[in-house]
Amino acid sequence: MEIEKQHVYISTVEVENLSDALFSGDEENGGSEERKTEINGNWIPATSITEAKINAKAKRRLRKNSSRDSGRGDSVSENGETQKAGLVVPTSPKGKVLDRRSRSGKGRGLPKKGGAGGKGVWGTPGQVYDVEEVDIKDPNYDDDQENCVYETVVLPLDERAFEKTLTPIIQEYFEHGDTNEVSEMLKDLNLGEMKYSVPVLAVSLALEGKASHREMTSKLISDLCGTVVSKTDVEKSFDKLLKDLPDLVLDSPRAPQLVGQFIARAVGDGILSSTYIDGYKGTVDSIQARAALDRATVLLSVTKGGKRIDNVWGSGGGQQSVKHLVKEIDMLLKEYLLSGDLLEAERCLQELEVPHFHHELVYEAIVMVLESTGEKTFKMMLDLLKSLSRSSVITMDQMKRGYERVYCEIPDINLDVPHSYSVLERFVEECFQAGIISKPLRDLCPSRGRKRFVSEGDGGRLKPESY
């Protein structure tokens, strides 16, 4: 037993010495013999015991090193070989960090590459579900939920929000002139009891605008009647306008006459009753309201049978024909020659609302100067062009275009007016001195070559101009 215990409890040092002796003996003897050890009556080769000890020691080291320390220091493989820190042993826990497979059988909850399934995914893309049927026996069933129709409720506009919302709409209408667009925008609003205020606001803005704006306002009220507002609303709106005339006069002195024209146009369009004016007889205390009703009465009495009044505001802007504009400008210049009022001539030109056609006035004014025989027309037209140029009513581009038209047609004008070249040169020079035209435009003025006389060669003496 003592012998067996001695064989069993062999220290590590003895095993190593034994291994060294064994291998050294093999080398000396050429490996002819193999030493054996008896354990529990069994003879086991010494090499097997040595390998078992080394493997056990290596496994203990691996178990001792945790996964957090596996990346530091050296490790020993199962074969007893030392591994460097940069190399990862296949059995090391760090090898599982680089493994892309799930560490548990349930996965990480990500959708599959094929499409359907996964956390937060409701089937394949494009999958159609059946309509969920309502269970009447469900404890949470509510019969009031069936056949429900949901719609957006728009609150009615108050007075402040009404003016803030509709003012940009009407001002934009003055630019594009599309009544259908205004009608669609007003239908989207819940006007409530403020419908009658639509014509009131439109007329109030038109009083401060141009004649074309007032014409567009009359057309807008006529088109909105029956779709957005009713005839009762139109009557109510004009009642309010007549009542507010004392305040409107402060901003627009011509408000009574203009409101009277709006009333006459509304009666002519058929959106206001013909007896509307008669209802105010003897009941009007305001001077402004009485003046407005008198103006409407006069306009309606001129027409036959209350026909539609189309020209109550005149035709302004691009609605006018070229022939009509030429006639208006000719009358404007003739009235100016009679009155000499520069401000009135400027106002009449602006009321035409044709800034793109102002070159016609420049052309007609110069032609009148060429056709005139006295200095009065010359001086008055020079003052007119100077005033219009300084006030920027006529732009430099329109002024230049008017002069260029005269330059092109001066040969034809000279057939009727023999001295037109000399008069034109003088007028152009005066305009340049007054700052009306530029130097390049003055230099473009054509000049007719002097006629050569037969006797011009006699001593080089020239004939006088009056010859």
UniProtKB/Swiss-Prot annotation:
Entry keywords, A to Z: Cytoplasm, Nucleus, Repeat, RNA-binding
UniProt cross-references to SMART domains, sorted A to Z: MA3
Residue ranges crossing the lipid bilayer per the database entry: none
The keyword Metal-binding belongs to this UniProt entry's keyword annotation: no
Annotated disulfide bonds: none
Record domain MI: where: 161-282, 324-447
GO cellular component terms, A-Z: cytoplasm; cytosol; nucleus
Motif Nuclear localization signal, residue numbers: 57-63, 446-452
Gly residues composition bias: residue spans: 112-123
Subcellular location: Nucleus; Cytoplasm
Superkingdom field: Eukaryota
Its job: Inhibits translation initiation and cap-dependent translation. May excert its function by hindering the interaction between EIF4A and EIF4G. Inhibits the helicase activity of EIF4A. Binds RNA. Does not seem to be involved in apoptosis.
Protein name in UniProt: Programmed cell death protein 4
Source organism: Gallus gallus (Chicken)
Name of the gene: PDCD4
